[in-house]
Amino acid sequence: VLKELADQPAHDLVNKKIVPDQIVPTGGYDIENLSDPSRRSAYHGSIETDRYGRSIPKQAHGTQNLDDYTSSSHRIMNAAVDLFDRLIDPTLLIRRLYIVANHIIPEDTALQKKDRFTQLDLFTDYAAEEQKQKANAADLERERKLQEAMLSIRKKFGKNAVLKAMNLEEGATAKDRNNQIGGHKA
């Protein structure tokens, strides 16, 4: 589900021609974690009160900086999953997940900012680094073209016209979320 949640904003970023360099995944825990005696005894973290006055485990929240400004769904998904695995308590039930993209700028501005300075040293093979950067740039360009093709198909035939295999796995919610309007059944 988290990969689906990270993939959708990446497509929105490509559509709007904007790029972030930071993502913030947040996971809120379910109230059942503290009402179930076995889970309650296993949990030793902080407890907060929700807006209804109920006690719930404190939500997991973290920030992951990306290497560069990007709208690559692959890089955003990997960063979100890595941070999620470090933050979320696997013994607790999760009620809600959301991902926020920070430090958003237009793509053309990001291309101008790409010329960053690097500290040189004697032990790095800069020819190999340059080859790696060229291969990475080619991969990002190929992914970008694929994302744009998927967006054009989705605009013409609907959001469920093109789905990834992860959207068809058991427990996946993207297909259902694509049929909703404002989070409600259409």
Where are these regions (language model features)?
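Basic, low-complexity intrinsically disordered segments
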Residues: 1-186
